[in-house]
Amino acid sequence: MNRYILFFIFLTGSVGGITAQQAKIDSSYANWYYQQRMAYFEKLPTIQRAVIFLGNSITERAEWQELLADYRYPVLNRGIGGDNSFGILARIDDVVRNKPRAVFLMDGINDQFRKLPHEVSIQNYRRIVRKIKMKSPRTKIYIQSALPINEMITTEDYTRGRNELVPELNKKLSQLAKEEDVVFIDLCPLFQDDEGRLSKEYTVDGVHLIPTAYIKWVKLLKDKKYL
């Protein structure tokens, strides 16, 4: 009997160990590029009441200042290629230190690439939103949807099976926005095809947008009176 008990303990302990390994969360973010961008931001002039676009490479690649050259408030790009919700959370105090007029937040796809559970991403988003509210109460907060990808174009293994997770993440982001009383902006209809993939019309690599796609993005923000 004791042998069976010991075997059961060994078996359940092993299964528990496997589960714990599978549930391990990758919260890293401060790679060399992240650190370089942060060092660059620290050296820029202080600008009060700006509109800030905050996110990963999809945000960073846009020429927001030129796209909004006629806008009545300063516009700042605070995108960092490869960033994720942990990285944005870590730098949000710096982002809102100068009391921005508005923050347009987009993240999510890099969380999916590293297979973070949606619950972890949403928790980070919630903490980001609440920090903005606490540090800069007058700042308007806009949560923008994660964009789909096109796995028929992408060549990286880490993108496989990720696109099917985007709709559920966006559903949770929309719910979060309601709970936190901030605005959710669904960008997916602008850029996805009939199959829910990032349209070939707007991407070359299956993940990032071509430059002209940002013109359409800004037009939506203006049409909706967010800008």
Q: What do the PLM-derived regions correspond to, one by one?
A:
Residues 118-128, 166-169:
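Charged helix-capping and loop-helix junction motifs
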Residues 99-108, 137:
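Proline-aspartate-enriched helix->loop->beta-strand connector
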Residues 57-61, 81-85, 109-114, 147-151, ...:
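Solvent-exposed loop/turn segments at secondary-structure junctions
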Residues 20-102:
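Serine-esterase "nucleophile elbow" of acetyl-processing enzymes
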Residues 22, 148-227:
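Catalytic His-Asp segment of secreted/periplasmic serine-dependent ester chemistry enzymes
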Residues 1-23:
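Bacterial Sec-dependent N-terminal signal peptides
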Residues 77-80, 109-121, 156-162:
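Surface-exposed cleft-lining segments at the edges of enzyme active sites
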